[in-house]
UniProtKB/Swiss-Prot annotation:
Classification lineage: Eukaryota, Viridiplantae, Streptophyta, Embryophyta, Tracheophyta
Native organism: Nicotiana tabacum
Main location: plastid
Oligomer status and interactors: PSII is composed of 1 copy each of membrane proteins PsbA, PsbB, PsbC, PsbD, PsbE, PsbF, PsbH, PsbI, PsbJ, PsbK, PsbL, PsbM, PsbT, PsbX, PsbY, PsbZ, Psb30/Ycf12, at least 3 peripheral proteins of the oxygen-evolving complex and a large number of cofactors. It forms dimeric complexes.
Gene from which this protein is expressed: psbJ
Record keyword Transmembrane present: yes
Name of the protein described by the UniProt record: Photosystem II reaction center protein J
Phenotype upon gene inactivation: Able to assemble functional PSII, however electron flow is deregulated; forward flow from Q(A) to plastoquinone is slower while reduction of the oxygen evolving complex is faster, loss of light-activated, redox-dependent phosphorylation of LCHII, plants senesce quickly. Plants are hypersensitive to light, cannot grow photoautotrophically and have drastically reduced oxygen-evolving capacity. Dramatic reduction in PSI subunits, almost complete loss of PsbP, a subunit of the oxygen-evolving complex.
Membership in a protein family: Belongs to the PsbJ family.
Membrane topology recorded in Swiss-Prot or TrEMBL: Single-pass membrane protein
GO-annotated cellular components: chloroplast thylakoid membrane; photosystem II reaction center
Location in the cell: Plastid, Chloroplast thylakoid membrane
Length: 40
């Protein structure tokens, strides 16, 4: 597992993807709760 030079490690991709998904879900629920996300 030493040839990860030049590529992004898979765990970084998974972590970033998880944060983005959680952020998008949080924004969606917050927007729909406050009445601003009805256009989404």
């Amino acid at each position: 597992m030493a040839d990860t030079t030049g590529r992004i490690p898979l765990w970084i991709i998974g972590t970033v993807a998880g944060i983005l998904v959680i952020g998008l879900i949080g924004i969606f629920f917050y927007g729909s709760y406050s009445g601003l996300g009805s256009s989404l």
